[in-house]
């Protein structure tokens, strides 16, 4: 880049700002556009598909209109860039007061990153948009996460082995981490597994003492004990997260919710592999369709949808809380008409959680306040409807909804019903709410009549009946006369000559224009002042309105779970502090949709805590394993479950080792990943955990695999004593583990008919003697010759005393079978 003195004052100012925010694309405000220069312009031009031009002779340049900048900023952020927004902080007139040649002052007012978005247009309404932070002190890790658009703020202490599941559960848009931690091999593997923007800082940024000062400063307390009981590593994570938010908002932080500690004992910990294998939020291929959330999310509000996802990410581990939710779901199942009325009222309910955040950040628009007024009106209607019920759950929600009629009345009196997204032009405040505004409105309303009177006067004066008075942004008001006429009156001053017309002005027209423009300007300023006062009043009530928003979201979730229960014939499970796990005629909540699903029982209660399932591939072993884990998850969020009867003792952790998860990018083979995941289960499971293991020990030599599988089953049975379902293709395993007192054996029922194998997907007691692998190979499209060859080898192996004693088997005969 050339020497700075070679550039214009504007470009020198741009370069000085760019040096401060080198990691960001700098959007530099010039009038009604945001401009980008140099390499930033090249990047933005390609990313946004906008024209790349030049300023001067060789400076790359492109720009986007100010009024539509949000969408462009969103596209840049989604493409992985951070965006520094540079605004003019004074007018050209104010700059000239300092000096005739003074450059307008500009400052970066905000840095836009994936985790700090608050604008609706840049966010997915039904998805939580978390900014997360991981800090580290010794062997403890602090995980803090915030949704800036709603104010949600949580933290918890964790261990290295739990970080994968923590990030998987949260799915943050952006993760803040130290340079040192980022470079650790163990952390590098975790980060590669998740798709989110990574922002790293040096180690001192995460210093716990520094973080404590930030926390105390933001919340106005002298000690963090005033906020709650936090571990040092939690303080580090929270304070560092807040400091980063303060940096991106350029010091402008509204009143934020206190960080709440998520105690590990308060929710069911679902490990990372289980979150992926159970497909709670997306399928293995990344699609939402086919996931559990896609099946049960019948919510009718964005807030409810986000709350339901939080329920699934953090299933409750307290049977009293679970039973309270179940009571509410059962109430709505039994009161269908009320349920439908409530859902009708809240359908399309404005996303006031995010609106309130924009109010607190002073980034709300007239449209936001109009939507807030509509929401308060719906809350009033909702309160009136549910007040007829005396049910304890409804009474609690009614209290949370509160009474906002005074604020609703104020909004109705002040705001006009329009969808203005910017405030500078006015036109959104009811003139009747302010005497001066009403007077200014009359002046503006009368301006058309006054202009018309002046036009008629000038037509009479000049004798030109086609004379017009028009206006544009360049000239303001002007008199236009056809070129075929000559105006001789000296009061008419020529302003512009065109091919077919001449434009004039007069002192009288200038005076009238000044009155109109002055009224418009004063009116816009006054509207902005009134709007600011209204927003300040709303900000004072944000906490109460926030409670109402949460109550609406909760109503949405509870009525949704009731609707799903009725539509899909779910039953209320018994959830208590026992170690029971008994499911009668359970079904897979996702697979059963649109199919004739075969229901099966599962009993892992005390004395029968482990089930070992054998059977061929495609018989339904993996589906059975997953369905019972999903039933457990549903039970722990307070939902009814797909079964005829269910009794589940509270689970502390759910572990899953199901399906291949080979990840070449991580440098691990399928078998290595399987062993790592199995080791985590054996080390972390407890007697209150639920473990599902599918085909443990495959991917290595038979003796190795069988030994590993037997050792894993023995460890779970004797040491962790977890409730467990294991599926295996080792037919020796049931015989070798038959002496375990708490194990039972099942297989999937198969029938052979006319030489074909029929999978009945029915679980029955017993041990499968065959795998039917050759039949599955045929279904998969094996060439006929290869299939016949496989049958030949199998017959030879069956003739041997033991299928691993193959030295005496002649496999050379019949090799020349060809496909037909």
Curated annotation (Swiss-Prot):
Signal peptide: none annotated. The keyword DNA repair applies. Keywords: ATP-binding, DNA damage, DNA repair, DNA-binding, Nucleotide-binding. GO terms for molecular function: ATP binding; ATP-dependent DNA damage sensor activity; damaged DNA binding; mismatched DNA binding. One of its GO terms (biological process) is mismatch repair. ATP binds at residues 615-622. InterPro entries: DNA_mismatch_repair_MutS, DNA_mismatch_repair_MutS-lik_N, DNA_mismatch_repair_MutS/MSH, DNA_mismatch_repair_MutS_C, DNA_mismatch_repair_MutS_clamp, DNA_mismatch_repair_MutS_core, DNA_mismatch_repair_MutS_N, DNA_mismatch_repair_MutS_sf. It holds the Pfam family MutS_I. The keyword Acetylation does not apply. HAMAP family: MutS (MF_00096). This protein is involved in the repair of mismatches in DNA. It is possible that it carries out the mismatch recognition step. This protein has a weak ATPase activity. NCBIfam families: mutS1, PRK05399.1. This is DNA mismatch repair protein MutS. The gene is mutS.
